[in-house]
């Protein structure tokens, strides 16, 4: 009898029509370079306390990010807006899938802004689940959160890693005009692997068109995208993806190793060595990106603040207003 590939099984059903993926992590042998330390420390504990007290969701927890210990111990976190239930079911993602039925926490923008103040953050990354159940995909809520942060913390830089909003450029503009400093939308993988890696409603070309629109509409805003490696892509496909991103006006590109969250997700096809990640970065920099961050444990928001911080006086003219030098150092 042939056994079914666990990655093809449907997520488990739980109450209220919400589907939850198996929360038991995969126990697979990984290369030495993928080992991380267990999260500890006073700052890590304080950040976790603030997140819990304000009923916030972080992508650090929901997506089982391997950098949670390092980032939280630095006193920074990526906030995940609009709940922890995503309307899409990408086969790489550990976030729960279901129908949030239009529910939103209207106090969330203020709660996030207050948390940023309490944590004394100088650079904040906001992301969210996909909310196809909302007419605007959550764009207004996203923009409201950015504005709330800027009102309470006017010097704080804000990066918005948004859904594709179904390609609705009016929704993209709503976020762009909220005061955001960096606009990101993740390509996730190369063209050939977009399906089955991403939800069927996601599109390689749509993501590129959203990023291109963002750069055309607001040249002063940094544009950014991220890809996972180890899903079966070839080096030539990676080069093609980099060229596509550059043609769309993307400023910053990140590459990281795909890690399988549970047995319900796609398996890892290959572990890419740190040396190969370095080679990919060099190829990307030769294409003219502002920065290419490439490494096994890199995620789209990993050390995002340093992209600007490490370049005092060296930003292109259209981004020179973001030159904050050492002022962007986190607590």
Curated annotation (Swiss-Prot):
It comes from the Bacteria. Its main location: cytoplasm. SMART domains: Elp3. The gene is lipA. Its EC number is 2.8.1.8. It catalyses: [[Fe-S] cluster scaffold protein carrying a second [4Fe-4S](2+) cluster] + N(6)-octanoyl-L-lysyl-[protein] + 2 oxidized [2Fe-2S]-[ferredoxin] + 2 S-adenosyl-L-methionine + 4 H(+) = [[Fe-S] cluster scaffold protein] + N(6)-[(R)-dihydrolipoyl]-L-lysyl-[protein] + 4 Fe(3+) + 2 hydrogen sulfide + 2 5'-deoxyadenosine + 2 L-methionine + 2 reduced [2Fe-2S]-[ferredoxin]. This is Lipoyl synthase. Its cofactor is [4Fe-4S] cluster. It comes from Deinococcus radiodurans (strain ATCC 13939 / DSM 20539 / JCM 16871 / CCUG 27074 / LMG 4051 / NBRC 15346 / NCIMB 9279 / VKM B-1422 / R1). Coiled coil: none annotated. [4Fe-4S] cluster 2 binds at residues 86, 90, 93. Keywords: 4Fe-4S, Cytoplasm, Iron, Iron-sulfur, Metal-binding, S-adenosyl-L-methionine, Transferase. Residues 72-290 form the Radical SAM core domain. Binds 2 [4Fe-4S] clusters per subunit. One cluster is coordinated with 3 cysteines and an exchangeable S-adenosyl-L-methionine. GO terms for cellular component: cytoplasm. [4Fe-4S] cluster 1 binds at residues 60, 65, 71, 301. Pathway: Protein modification; protein lipoylation via endogenous pathway; protein N(6)-(lipoyl)lysine from octanoyl-[acyl-carrier-protein]: step 2/2.
